[in-house]
């Protein structure tokens, strides 16, 4: 756990190109890089564990918020708010995951395509939208396309918040965005 957390912090702080075992070792306050090599066969395995840790934390936060709601419209709103809140309140984890995805996309590391796909996936959101449509809460829509649109909007709200209002509360943006999508896709 200590090594994985140090990996997340190192990736976020100095980026994947400089995230060596030595840098991670310093961050973890370990006496030797051999301790990392003992537990992990190489960077791909270590970065996989780091990404899985961030994804599990994000998914747990999302699931908890969504599960509290009883309607699909409310679940969608909770999903949007939880996503924006997680990303803006956990910038170290978010940046580390972004670094890993960028590494995979740039083909600078192999064996992590599944991790990058999981990080960029809109499958759970697509499923939520499809269930809401089937329950009659959302109008007829292409659930996958709408999930991609919502995902892009979330990314842009986060980017705007971080660049413009970095110290401000992200929740008002999140709630307004959730309201916009609710009005757009609610059954009439």
Each model region followed by its residue ranges:
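Generic hydrophobic, amphipathic alpha-helix propensity
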Residues: 1-8, 24, 50-58, 125
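Short hydrophobic clusters on alpha-helical segments that form packing/core surfaces
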Residues: 3, 7-11, 83, 181
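Amphipathic alpha-helical packing segments from all-alpha helical-bundle domains
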Residues: 56-64, 89, 107-135, 144-148
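Amphipathic alpha-helical segments used for helix-helix packing
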Residues: 88-109, 163
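C-terminal peripheral helix-coil segments that are non-catalytic and often amphipathic
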Residues: 85, 122-134, 152-188
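Helix-turn-helix
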Residues: 2, 10-45, 49
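Hydrophobic alpha-helical connector segments
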Residues: 63-93, 146-150, 174
